[in-house]
């Protein structure tokens, strides 16, 4: 089991560390802009950092669920690579949003594409998993004809 999920576990841990980094950035922004908890509003510079962290936190459970389902039922390497791309896009999103609301858009779209790709891989993997054996074999034969290099 460990060997089969090591890549997914690594990407998960990197994601947790990234979430911790975002939280530390909010703490730093609170100190810089003198915004004490539980306040969530202040100068626009603080609010952008705060919103970026909250937005990233809101999507993290979706990311983790699709990463693991895609990795287990589709392909661990493909899911891990897509997960790394998602995390990198989220880092760029956070950094861009901290600068200005406009700078968040390109990384936001990139992370959304990565998340949708994970959803597609997870759904396809589950579909194939639940297909009856004869249909699954026919599908794989059809794919081998369609993609002879694979």
From Swiss-Prot:
**GO terms of molecular function:** enzyme activator activity; glutathione binding; glutathione peroxidase activity; glutathione transferase activity; identical protein binding; leukotriene-C4 synthase activity; lipid binding; protein-containing complex binding
State the annotated membrane topology for this chain. Multi-pass membrane protein
For side Cytoplasmic, which residue ranges?
A: 1-6, 70-73, 125-150
What organism does the UniProt record list as the source?
A: Rattus norvegicus
Residues annotated to bind glutathione: 30, 51-55, 58-59, 93-97
Q: Which domain of life is it from?
A: Eukaryota
Where found in the cell?
Answer: Nucleus outer membrane; Endoplasmic reticulum membrane; Nucleus membrane
Q: What is its main location?
A: nucleus
The protein here is known as: Leukotriene C4 synthase
**Which residues does the entry assign to the active site, renumbered to this chain?**
31 (proton donor), 104 (proton acceptor)
Q: Kindly list the organism's lineage.
A: Eukaryota, Metazoa, Chordata, Craniata, Vertebrata
What EC number(s) is this enzyme filed under? 4.4.1.20, 2.5.1.-
Disulfide linkage = none
Q: State which pathway it belongs to.
A: Lipid metabolism; leukotriene C4 biosynthesis
Tell me what turns on expression of this protein.
Answer: Up-regulated by all-trans retinoic acid.
Topology: which residues are Lumenal? 28-48, 95-104
